Regions:
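Class I S-adenosyl-L-methionine-dependent methyltransferase catalytic core
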Residues: 1-199
C-alpha cells in the first residue's frame, strides 16, 4: 500500500525538530496518543455526537470517545488491529455521507498541515476539527499561511508533557521532551485564537 506521498514502503523520515532520531521513526509515523490527553480535552470542549478519528491506530482515542458515548468512525491508512477500522487514506477521502462529523485525531506530524487543511476542506460550518499537535506547529512560513486563512479558534496548551508512544508501546516509551497542544478549528472562524492551558 502506498502512503500519502506515493511511497510504497510507507516509511516516513522526520522533518523539523524532534526528540526522535530518523532511525526511531515508526512506520507511517505512528505514535499513539496518551488517552488522558483526550479525556482532559472532553472536560473543556463540547463536540457533536458524531466523530471521525482518521488516524485511529490501535484505537487509543477512539476508545475514549466511545466510552463517552460518541458515535465514532475510526479509520487509518493501515489496519493496526482496532476493531472496526476502515482502511483509507484520509488525505484523499471525502466527508462521510450522512450526518456531519467532528474530526478529532493526532495526525502523522509530517503531514499535519495537510491533515488540517483537508479536514477543513471537507468540513461544514457546523463541525469542529481538533488536532493533537506539537506546540512547534505554530512555527513556520507555510503554517503561518494556513493560520492566516484558517485560524484555530482555541489552542489548549499542555502544561505537563504527554507521551506519544512509538508503535503504541507505552510500556517502553521514553519520557517525552515534546510540548503538545490541542488545536481546535471551527470552519469559518476568522478571529484571533484563544489560548488556554490544561493539565
Amino acid at each position: 500500500m502506498k502512503d500519502w506521498t506515493g511511497n510504497d514502503k510507507s516509511i516516513y523520515s522526520t522533518l523539523g525538530a524532534s526528540n526522535h532520531t530518523e532511525k526511531e521513526r515508526e512506520t507511517n509515523d505512528y505514535y499513539a496518543t496518551d488517552p488522558k490527553a483526550l479525556e482532559l480535552l472532553l472536560e473543556l470542549e463540547d463536540f457533536s455526537h458524531f466523530i471521525w478519528e482518521p488516524s485511529c491506530g490501535e484505537g487509543h482515542l477512539s476508545k475514549v470517545l466511545k466510552n463517552h458515548g460518541f458515535d465514532v468512525l475510526s479509520s487509518d491508512i493501515v489496519d493496526r488491529g482496532f476493531e472496526g477500522t476502515q482502511v483509507l487514506d484520509f488525505l484523499t477521502s471525502e466527508a462521510p455521507k450522512g450526518m456531519p462529523r467532528d474530526i478529532i485525531t493526532n495526525p502523522p506530524y509530517k503531514f499535519a498541515k495537510e491533515f488540517v487543511k483537508h479536514a477543513l476542506d471537507i468540513s461544514t460550518n457546523t463541525t469542529k476539527v481538533a488536532m493533537f499537535l506539537k506546540l512547534q506547529f505554530l512555527e513556520g512560513k507555510a503554517r503561518r499561511a494556513l493560520f492566516e486563512k484558517h485560524p484555530p479558534k482555541k489552542i489548549y496548551v499542555a502544561t505537563k508533557r504527554f507521551v506519544c508512544a512509538p508503535n503504541g508501546d507505552f510500556e517502553n516509551a521514553p519520557s517525552s521532551a515534546v510540548a503538545y497542544a490541542w488545536f481546535i478549528w471551527e470552519k469559518g472562524y476568522t478571529g484571533d485564537p484563544i489560548v488556554r492551558w490544561f493539565n
